[in-house]
Amino acid sequence: MGRRRVEIKRIENKSSRQVTFCKRRNGLMEKARQLSILCGSSVALFIVSSTGKLYNSSSGDSMAKIISRFKIQQADDPETLDLEDKTQDYLSHKELLEIVQRKIEEAKGDNVSIESLISMEEQLKSALSVIRARKTELLMELVKNLQDKEKLLKEKNKVLASEVGKLKKILETGDERAVMSPENSSGHSPPETLPLLK
């Protein structure tokens, strides 16, 4: 009995997804190394995880040399530029989304190859990873700002509490002096002593 074919779809369980990613990433890198040795080819491999972490590996030639060859070929054939190369000069997410939307509209045609769709899917995943990383960065900055404000408010409250304590002591000391003063004991001057009768 042959092995059951595993359906290729997104793994919902986060832990299982991470384990599968690590295993398949290592397997892919090993396959790339074997391809380089068996066929004498140069292989460069870039992998971006769902958390935005980049992994890369090269076999045959160095990564820099392979990338240099890639850039030369891209310059000779501009039509092969992928979405990332086309959008590297765009600064806003709005412009990026507009380009993605246009690509999706183009993909509705019948002349789009499966390779183009797969490439576009990978570009969208990369864009989402960048956006998620930026979102996390902004949230961390917001949390830090809130923590700084909380710390500042606590320090101000501490200073105010100290000032209130000092005022209370001053008021209490003033009341004690007023009570001990002879003129304030009954509200009148002390009575004069009558002379003794001779």
From Swiss-Prot:
Gene3D superfamilies cross-referenced by the UniProt entry: Transcription factor, MADS-box
GO molecular function: DNA-binding transcription factor activity; DNA-binding transcription factor activity, RNA polymerase II-specific; protein dimerization activity; RNA polymerase II cis-regulatory region sequence-specific DNA binding
Induction text: Up-regulated by vernalization. Repressed by VIL2, AGL6, CLF, EMF2 and FIE via epigenetic chromatin H3K27me3 and H3K9me2 regulation during the vegetative development.
Keyword terms, alphabetized: Developmental protein, DNA-binding, Flowering, Nucleus, Transcription, Transcription regulation
Domain MADS-box residues, every copy: 1-61
Transmembrane segments: none
Alphabetized SMART domains for the sequence: MADS (SM00432)
GO biological process, one term: vernalization response
Compartments reported by the entry: Nucleus
GO terms under cellular component: nucleus
Residue span, K-box domain: 80-173
Cited InterPro entries: MADS-box/MEF2_TF, TF_Kbox, TF_MADSbox, TF_MADSbox_sf
Annotated function: Transcription factor involved in the negative regulation of flowering time in short days, probably through the photoperiodic and vernalization pathways. Prevents premature flowering, particularly in the cv. Landsberg erecta background. In non-inductive photoperiods (e.g. short days), required for flowering through VIL2-mediated maintenance of the epigenetically repressed state of MAF5 via H3K9me2 and plant homeodomain / polycomb repressive complex 2 (PHD-PRC2)-dependent H3K27me3.
UniProt xrefs under PANTHER family: SERUM RESPONSE FACTOR HOMOLOG (PTHR48019)
Protein name in UniProt: Protein MADS AFFECTING FLOWERING 5
The organism of origin for this protein: Arabidopsis thaliana (Mouse-ear cress)
Gene: MAF5
